[in-house]
Amino acid sequence: FPPHKGKFDKKFIELVIIVDHSXXTYK
């Protein structure tokens, strides 16, 4: 993947983790 794609994926994963920890509203 291009570097910017990797950064996006990392930030997206971090966001999912944060939302998941806030009572799973993402799911």
From Swiss-Prot:
Expressed by the venom gland. GO terms for biological process: proteolysis. It comes from Echis multisquamatus (Central Asian sand viper). It comes from the Eukaryota. It is found in: Secreted. Heterodimer of a metalloproteinase subunit and a regulatory subunit comprising two homologous disulfide-linked lectins (AC P81798). Binds 1 zinc ion per subunit. The keyword Nucleus does not apply. This is Zinc metalloproteinase multactivase catalytic subunit.
